[in-house]
From Swiss-Prot:
This is Secretory carrier-associated membrane protein 4. Keywords: Cell membrane, Coiled coil, Cytoplasmic vesicle, Membrane, Transmembrane, Transmembrane helix, Transport. PANTHER family: SECRETORY CARRIER-ASSOCIATED MEMBRANE PROTEIN 4 (PTHR10687:SF91), SECRETORY CARRIER-ASSOCIATED MEMBRANE PROTEIN SCAMP (PTHR10687). The chain crosses the membrane at residues 149-169, 181-201, 216-236, 255-275. One of its GO terms (biological process) is protein transport. The gene is SCAMP4. Residues 1-69 are annotated as: Disordered. Belongs to the SCAMP family. Its main location: membrane.
Length: 313
């Protein structure tokens, strides 16, 4: 840079080390691997980066035509004409009219059946496996619901007593009392539970619902039999029923000396039959007081007299 003033042109070609930095490198005599120019204080000499080696990657497969389309192939749905719409509208109106007619017919029949005293009894109890009809809250008058609920409790109490009786007799059979008493206990349960429902509970339910005097008489007849059975089972003397087939006080006393556990079971059965007897006596007392106080007794006598007169003629 010696001999050059500060006013000289740095891009002017000349001899020595004065080089135009923008001149073609091929016209210079420098080597291909080095830079043939110097750029002064603001230029740095850098080597050009070499090209990356060629890779042998297989090309990607072509994308399907609907790759970026989230919708499936469109389906051509023919639009209904106005004639088809009118036809369907007429069909719907005809079906609606038919349903309204059937609904009115069913309602008319239900009202006629209700006026005649006929009530459809759908099975609704127990809720998990309906086997009987029992809707005290909706069908029984409010002033009679308490008595009906207690009567239903006495029905459930009888079922519980007979089921516990099977357990106790099974324990006695295991201890050597023989299979005969077990079969008798099963027979008591199979006949007693549905018999109690059909012979006295359902007549009482219908009598409370419709206030029928004859149904009250049917209830009194078989409910007295029910009370007599409960009292007999609580005592359980060996007169009518065989041996220890009922969990009464007498079998409990005879078993407590030989097998304590079986004796305790029989004493529990004795207590359950006693409670069932007391509850049943309360129910029949309440029903009888209502029966006499509401005039159903005189009505039943009149109906019985009319029935006897019709039978005589």
């Amino acid at each position: 840079m010696a001999g050059r003033s500060r006013y000289d042109n740095p891009f002017e070609e000349g001899g020595g080390d004065e080089v135009n930095p923008f001149a073609d490198k091929a016209s210079k005599g420098g080597s291909a691997g080095q830079s043939s120019y110097s750029g002064g204080a603001f230029y740095t000499t850098q080597s050009r980066p070499s090209a990356p080696p060629a890779t042998h990657l297989s090309p990607l497969p072509p994308e399907p035509a609907d790759f970026y389309n989230d919708f499936s192939t469109p389906v051509d749905i023919p639009m209904d004409t106005s004639k088809d719409m009118k036809t369907r509208e007429k069909e719907l109106l005809a079906k609606e009219a038919e349903l309204n007619r059937r609904e009115k017919e069913i309602k008319r029949r239900e009202e006629a059946a209700a006026r005649a005293g006929i009530v459809l009894e759908d099975k609704n109890w127990p809720p998990f496996f309906p086997i009987i009809h029992n809707d005290i809250g909706n069908e029984i008058p409010v002033h009679l619901q308490r008595t009906q609920y207690v009567a239903f409790a006495s029905l459930l109490g009888l079922v519980l007593c007979l089921f516990w009786n099977i357990i106790c007799v099974t324990a006695a059979w295991i201890k050597g009392e023989g299979p005969k008493i077990w079969f008798l206990a099963v027979i008591y349960f199979i006949l007693g539970c549905p018999g109690a429902y059909y012979l006295w509970y359902r007549p009482l339910y219908r009598a409370m619902r419709n206030e029928s005097a004859l149904k009250f008489g049917w209830f009194f007849l078989f409910y007295l039999v029910h009370i007599a059975f409960c009292v007999y089972a609580a005592v359980s003397p060996s007169i009518l029923f065989v041996g220890k087939s009922l969990t009464g006080i007498f079998p409990a006393i005879s078993l407590i000396g030989n097998t304590v556990i079986v004796g305790v079971f029989y004493f529990l059965g004795f207590a359950m039959f006693c409670l069932e007897s007391l509850l049943s006596m309360w129910v029949i007392q309440r029903v009888y007081l209502y029966f006499r106080g509401s005039g159903k007794e005189a009505e039943m006598k009149r109906e019985a007299a009319r029935s006897a007169a019709r039978a005589a003629f």
